[in-house]
UniProtKB/Swiss-Prot annotation:
Subunit annotation: Part of the Bam complex.
HAMAP family, sorted: OM_assembly_BamE (MF_00925)
N-palmitoyl cysteine lipid sites: 22
Its biological purpose: Part of the outer membrane protein assembly complex, which is involved in assembly and insertion of beta-barrel proteins into the outer membrane. May have a structural role in maintaining the cell envelope integrity.
Primary gene name: bamE
Location relative to the cell: Cell outer membrane
Segments of skewed composition (Polar residues): 123-132
Gene Ontology molecular function: any one: protein-macromolecule adaptor activity
A GO CC term assigned to this protein in UniProt: Bam protein complex
Main location: membrane
Any Pfam family hit: BamE
Region feature (Disordered): 121-176
Protein name per UniProt: Outer membrane protein assembly factor BamE
Length: 176
């Protein structure tokens, strides 16, 4: 009896230890995105002096247009990955009295895009081939050998005559 209890206790602890690395499947949580998606490329297209219409074409409709500050447009974007922390980005565009873009403020600034920041100073990659693998200069095209299929096809193409496009006859306007 004592041996059976000890054996059951050991098996229970071994089973619990084996299940310690397992977990119950969690509920799937979707990514929650809200607001206007604003990219660095969109910000880089903005120039001082652009009209509201041009800015709206590039950026889309602003999320917030303040009634008391009509010369300010706010673009907000937030994303919360399923089960993760919420990240928020904000850009405010300011217009002067003549409805032209005067400045911007926020998490994005004109300059290096995120891709370029990840890749380094330059976003472009230069590939050079070793001298022995470089492509030879363009070879001059040799005429096809007489009697070859290529020569026969070339002759048929050269001898092709244009054919006039047929025009449909007008419909009879008189009723029957």
């Amino acid at each position: 009896m004592q041996n059976a209890k000890l054996m059951l206790t050991c098996l229970a602890f071994a089973g619990l230890a084996a299940l310690a690395g397992c977990s119950f499947p969690g509920v799937y949580k979707i990514d929650i995105q809200q607001g206007n998606v604003v990219t660095q490329d969109m910000i880089d297209q903005l120039r001082p002096g652009m009209t509201r219409r041009q800015v709206r074409f590039i950026m889309g409709n602003p999320l917030i247009v303040d009634t008391f500050h009509a010369n300010r447009w706010d673009y907000l974007y937030s994303i919360q990955p399923g089960g993760g922390r919420r990240q928020q980005e904000r850009v405010s565009l300011f217009f002067n009295d003549s409805d032209q873009l005067a400045g911007l403020n926020g998490d994005f600034m004109p300059g290096v895009s995120r891709d370029e920041a990840i890749l380094g100073k330059e976003g472009s990659t230069t590939v050079t081939q070793p001298a022995d693998q470089q492509k030879p200069e363009a070879q001059k095209e040799e005429p096809p050998k007489p009697g070859s299929t290529l020569e026969q096809l070339q002759r048929e193409v050269d001898e092709a005559q244009p054919v006039p496009v047929p025009t449909p006859e007008p419909l009879d306007p008189s009723p029957q």
